[in-house]
Amino acid sequence: MPRRTDLHHVLVIGSGPIVIGQACEFDYSGTQACRVLRAEGLQVSLVNSNPATIMTDPEFADHTYVEPITPAFVERVIAQQAERGNKIDALLATLGGQTALNTAVALYESGVLEKYGVELIGADFDAIQRGEDRQRFKDIVAKAGGESARSRVCFTMAEVRETVAELGLPVVVRPSFTMGGLGSGIAYSTDEVDRMAGAGLAASPSANVLIEESIYGWKEFELELMRDGHDNVVVVCSIENVDPMGVHTGDSVTVAPAMTLTDREYQRMRDLGIAILREVGVDTGGCNIQFAVNPRDGRLIVIEMNPRVSRSSALASKATGFPIAKIAAKLAIGYTLDEIVNDITGETPACFEPTLDYVVVKAPRFAFEKFPGADPTLTTTMKSVGEAMSLGRNFVEALGKVMRSLETTRAGFWTAPDPDGGIEEALTRLRTPAEGRLYDIELALRLGATVERVAEASGVDPWFIAQINELVNLRNELVAAPVLNAELLRRAKHSGLSDHQIASLRPELAGEAGVRSLRVRLGIHPVYKTVDTCAAEFEAQTPYHYSSYELDPAAETEVAPQTERPKVLILGSGPNRIGQGIEFDYSCVHAATTLSQAGFETVMVNCNPETVSTDYDTADRLYFEPLTFEDVLEVYHAEMESGSGGPGVAGVIVQLGGQTPLGLAHRLADAGVPIVGTPPEAIDLAEDRGAFGDLLSAAGLPAPKYGTATTFAQARRIAEEIGYPVLVRPSYVLGGRGMEIVYDEETLQGYITRATQLSPEHPVLVDRFLEDAVEIDVDALCDGAEVYIGGIMEHIEEAGIHSGDSACALPPVTLGRSDIEKVRKATEAIAHGIGVVGLLNVQYALKDDVLYVLEANPRASRTVPFVSKATAVPLAKACARIMLGATIAQLRAEGLLAVTGDGAHAARNAPIAVKEAVLPFHRFRRADGAAIDSLLGPEMKSTGEVMGIDRDFGSAFAKSQTAAYGSLPAQGTVFVSVANRDKRSLVFPVKRLADLGFRVLATEGTAEMLRRNGIPCDDVRKHFEPAQPGRPTMSAVDAIRAGEVNMVINTPYGNSGPRIDGYEIRSAAVAGNIPCITTVQGASAAVQGIEAGIRGDIGVRSLQELHRVIGGVER
């Protein structure tokens, strides 16, 4: 059946900002879909609020709307296209995660799709409802001959209590229509039931929750299926969770294909999955079904289904080489599976199910260290911020590779000291699921626990425990062997052990370098295998490789020779984490595509299954490998061999993937690997405070006073000389890890005690903290001679809030022409002083007309995608070309950069773009169930970002808030409680809110000051003050929890009562999903946003249209 001829214009909805539970896997799927639809001659409109995505680059759609993903904004897009005589025929919402699906459902139910004649494709409304609505899905499972957990959908707390009495405790609480398990959990007591179900009823857009029997401890499996309009169904992949039920699948280590299912169990699961898919009615696309198996009696139940492309779909795509999103998009426009050719083989159709001759392991990356006080227990609510994936010829090889891919402080077994305690302590820790469980499993086995005892304590299947036990046995052999011979070393490498791990067991080999030289001497190198979807039955056309150490010394590598073009290796950024996310992947993808077009063979090395960079057709070759020195060096050697007799490897790019590749630059250069762009010595110069300070002094550029300390006494002396407040931090960090603003000696002592353990080989830096300064961020290019300013951003929050968490505006809103010229001159001096070839990011603080240099990073920054979208200049592409020898003058002549001028001075008619950070506070709870503090500081906490772009600052800021957190209130009550130093600055914004008709609530001191300034307000007492006669009966926290407050303005100060009170206020706001503003500047911006919303003139415009207005570079 050829594609439908009645479809001409398709609207694709993306997934918005990166949040826990919904990450860049949807950029990967959306990018594939847009490419496919346009290749089929269809017109594509795209709505996505996330500027860091590849899919929002103007070349992927005809009309790219970087707008909030809400029903109201999407309706404006549909209406605008209809008004222009360019009617949208269909809406594809199955590739943008839960956000897109919920938006599509709302548009259908409100009649918008019917009004404009837009058809839902991929999955129709009924299929979405049947798959997502818990009760309807349960009925379908029964009809298909399957079984669900005993459960009931409840709409009120009374129904919840009645159901719990019937099922008995513990129970699982699950809201409908949410993603990443948000609001779900296992309740062991009636108090926990009340708390979770109450929160669940609030979290679910349909205001109902499912209460089900607990199947905690059962084995969990997933099937990834696809179905076409002719009822052909393929099972793309089976996935097994190593962690048992009770841990969200996104937080579990997972394996593909499933390892512990019998053939009979698998066939039963497969038959049931296909029957459910048909009953639900997903007739043109992909879906994911989760199952649980009772390990004691084999009882199989169906947990849930996602009638859309999901996180697991991205994993299954990368694991098998079967491009699920791409095929889903083709199925949605009418093709059948037998008509679609498998890209990887070039000859088999998509109705051939993938076959794997390797094992894939995915492991989650957490960030609990960023949220002090958060409960680290793993539950049914997802908490991981990223993931890594690896491929190997056996389970333990893939496991070893994925553990070192995570880049945590422990790079695999035996690379860090064991925790205190013996077997019993390890087994006790295993009973509560937490990050790093694999280490406790290995430790318990090594200390003598049996496989059965460890399986009983952890709930992990004995097969996986036995595999880790084999590693423990191998460790004993490695330690005991008199000499490490070729056979034993080869077995160790075949079992996934790194040189670093082997070196930790054999001290006489003098570290990792000693193991490497022994390996080289014995001729032990990895071979590179190919992901081909068919277990080598057909030849692969796409070079997608993974390494393996074969036991047979004669095993051959599958990397084909390529001698025509010079090669460039691009090192990706590894698993997403706070501080290093999709923004860096964006730059890597741009480098791959632009250098390929410029005549280079591009080679991508990365291990993140969610990203566009690890798509098999982004670079000319892909290596799915850990980003460690050992693994990258082996890839380099493989590429040198494959290019032997040709131009060879021109160099390795380390400055686009964030701190991970930068950290490898020196060791790679020392090993003879050519690094292109800014040399490693220059990177060091920018990181070394002494050398960088000298550079600034020579250029006459002021910087905040600072000192370097290795002891508390030194830090105290420096702080006294500089004057409090001071900013303290370890050196060499990304995302402000371990940074704090310290107001007194007592807090300083506490910090030094904690932070010096964080990076023992580097001292602590103590800087003067510039209060009330305006922070400025600059992205620039330098070719060694000329400097091109990409964009100058003004932060909305004051200096002291991490740049990744601060909202910022481009072009700057309050900076004058002379300020901008100061910034330009300083940036030029720094670029030349460091010796930058490529991108440079500099952060400044402007205070009392003095421009202070805070830091400079000679690499791609996380703002590069935002600046590129806002200015229409592809900075990452330009950077890649400059690193490989192009000049800025040459790129101007080619039209890649503006012919004259640069991004320092925006055109008069340029729109204002606002970037806002998206923070995951609502995902975390303290152990007692309380919310964690939403206070911002110098340590980065955001997981993603959105962009609002419009004619004026107020409208752009309002859009950014709507996209990140939901609309700012247009009326209602605002609660104000601020530190004394902020009271004067807040008079004007609060007065404006009162004039707009808002009721103002305030605590006693703030209320008194507001009334003195003619602002009517009502008093509430502070949370820690007791209720007394003559005082307000309601506290601020009571008012927020009672739903009487629509917005909170709360600025904190110090560590005493007000600080604690502030924590309670902000936590209550987070729990109630109420806008909570913690800075004066944020309050002023919010007022402008509210005014823009009340005026009602916030429209939508595509990037293509905006870029024409800017007069930007059209590509």
From Swiss-Prot:
Binding residues annotated for Mg(2+) 3, in chain numbering: Q843, E855
Keywords linked to the UniProt accession: Amino-acid biosynthesis, Arginine biosynthesis, ATP-binding, Ligase, Magnesium, Manganese, Metal-binding, Nucleotide-binding, Pyrimidine biosynthesis, Repeat
Gene Ontology terms for molecular function: ATP binding; carbamoyl-phosphate synthase (ammonia) activity; carbamoyl-phosphate synthase (glutamine-hydrolyzing) activity; metal ion binding
Binding-site list for Mg(2+) 1: Q290, E304
Domain MGS-like: 966-1113
UniProt-annotated binding residues for Mn(2+) 4: E855, N857
Binding residues for ATP 2: R729, R768, L770, E775, G800, I801, H802, S803, Q843, E855
Binding site for Mg(2+) 4: E855, N857
Protein name: Carbamoyl phosphate synthase large chain
Gene name linked to the record: carB
